[in-house]
């Protein structure tokens, strides 16, 4: 397989590492935030990109990305932990070794809480000359003939220790200096809980209260709607009762007209029977009977028309009443809709 020549970026210089740690200190609240959500993650990525821009502004010739400066910081932190562990082992001695768990706990606590600088503006770099002598080729662009990814973040242990030794005291000066210079961002994270951690329960309580209030309003609106529906059903029931009464009245009127018709028919039949009376009497009777029958017919017809007129007037009245009720229900429905929209807002 053809060997590909890939360029690897040069190692971080002293100035780049100094700038990196300074910028991390300025953005410690964002970078070391314990909150886990999309907004915080985006802010962290933006912070690392800003740190990378500040590192690139040093002008060492390399363009670092946010991922690279983050990896550089993690390597620096890991090296400090290893050096602290070695120092503790030397102090304790081989005859009285500390338990591994105690070493890990004390080391993690001190690194996380106390790693840092004495001042944001005055840094005490102890080993810059030695760093330049030991790592003189760090600014050179290295070319490797290999097949792996050129952006691989792994460094060899020896190279890493050489590269990072400039930012911490060496073993020859451990007796003259404190254990470590301190970074402010770590101890504030572990010793003082985030203010938002106290605000979150109150926020959840307020949200639950709002939910309960909205649910209560919804139930009130639902109760009003049911009351309106109940009234509408009552009105509908009353209307049906009136219609039943009207139906019965019309049925009685129909029976009455049937009886009148039968009565007229009997009168006609009786008028056609032969009479033994005199011709004069028959003539007078024949004159008066048709007149009486016609009069009765007209009278019955007039009464029927009057009843029909009354019925139509009653139906018209019922129709107007139903129309008014329909409009009232429409207005009530619109009022409930407006009230519901106001509650939701």
Swiss-Prot record:
Entry keyword annotation includes Coiled coil: yes
Modification sites for Phosphoserine: 106
Organism annotation: Bos taurus (Bovine)
Lineage: Eukaryota, Metazoa, Chordata, Craniata, Vertebrata
Modified residues (Phosphothreonine): 188
PANTHER family, A to Z: MYB/SANT-LIKE DNA-BINDING DOMAIN-CONTAINING PROTEIN 4 (PTHR21732), MYB_SANT-LIKE DNA-BINDING DOMAIN-CONTAINING PROTEIN 4 (PTHR21732:SF0)
Domain (Myb-like) ranges: 4-77
Residues in coiled coil: 203-345
Identification of the protein by name: Myb/SANT-like DNA-binding domain-containing protein 4
Pfam family, one: Myb_DNA-bind_5
UniProt keyword annotations, A-Z: Coiled coil, Isopeptide bond, Phosphoprotein, Ubl conjugation
Database matches in InterPro entries: MSANTD4, Myb_DNA-bind_5
Glycyl lysine isopeptide (Lys-Gly) (interchain with G-Cter in SUMO2), cross-linked positions: 9, 114, 142, 237, 254, 273
Any one of the GO CC terms: nucleus
Annotated segments matching region Disordered: 141-160
Cysteines paired by S-S bonds: none
């Amino acid at each position: 397989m053809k060997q590909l020549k890939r360029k690897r970026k040069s190692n971080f210089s002293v100035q780049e590492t100094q700038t990196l740690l300074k910028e991390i200190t300025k953005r410690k609240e964002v970078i070391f935030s314990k909150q886990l959500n999309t907004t915080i993650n985006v802010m962290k990525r933006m912070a690392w990109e800003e740190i990378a821009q500040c590192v690139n502004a040093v002008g060492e010739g390399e363009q670092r990305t946010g991922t690279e400066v983050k990896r550089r910081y993690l390597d620096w932190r890991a090296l400090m932990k290893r050096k602290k562990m070695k120092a503790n082992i030397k102090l304790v001695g081989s005859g009285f070794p500390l338990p591994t768990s105690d070493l890990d706990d004390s080391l993690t606590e001190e690194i996380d809480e106390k790693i840092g600088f004495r001042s944001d503006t005055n840094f005490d770099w102890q080993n810059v000359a030695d760093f330049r002598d030991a790592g003189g080729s760090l600014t050179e662009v290295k070319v490797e003939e290999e097949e792996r990814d050129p952006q691989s973040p792994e460094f060899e242990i020896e190279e890493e220790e050489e590269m990072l030794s400039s930012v911490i005291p060496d073993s020859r000066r451990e007796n003259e200096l404190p254990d470590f210079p301190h970074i402010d961002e770590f101890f504030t994270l572990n010793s003082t809980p985030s203010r938002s951690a106290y605000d979150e329960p109150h926020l959840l309580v307020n949200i639950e209260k709002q939910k309960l209030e909205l649910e209560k309003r919804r139930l009130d609106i639902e109760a009003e709607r049911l009351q309106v529906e109940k009234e509408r059903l009552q009105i509908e029931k009353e209307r049906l009762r009136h219609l039943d009464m009207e139906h019965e009245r019309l049925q009685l009127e129909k029976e009455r007209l049937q009886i009148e018709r039968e009565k007229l028919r009997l009168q006609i039949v009786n008028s056609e029977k032969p009479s033994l009376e005199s011709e004069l009497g028959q003539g007078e009777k024949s004159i008066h009977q048709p007149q009486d029958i016609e009069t009765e017919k007209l009278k019955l017809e007039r009464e029927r028309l009057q009843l029909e007129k009354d019925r139509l007037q009653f139906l018209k009245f019922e129709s107007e009443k139903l129309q008014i009720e329909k409009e009232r229900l429409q207005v009530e429905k619109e009022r409930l809709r407006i009230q519901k929209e106001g509650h939701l807002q």
